[in-house]
Amino acid sequence: MRHISPEELIALHDANISRYGGCRECLIRVGQRPLSGEFRPELPTKRSPTFSKSPPPTWWLQREGIYSMMPISVPR
């Protein structure tokens, strides 16, 4: 597997944020039908705020567990 630099990772994340317009937690709820039967895909709730800007890259990386999953630099 090719090594991905942190800069590439952040760029990929920013591309995903701009393409899909939100964080993964928000996107999971977008388009789901509430128990009442109403279907309002664009309605933000208190549990899923819509971010006008993407969260800080370091916070995102830590939240996604990438820091613990793969080392930042691997000497070859």
Curated annotation (Swiss-Prot):
<protein>
    <recommendedName>
        <fullName>Protein tec</fullName>
    </recommendedName>
</protein>
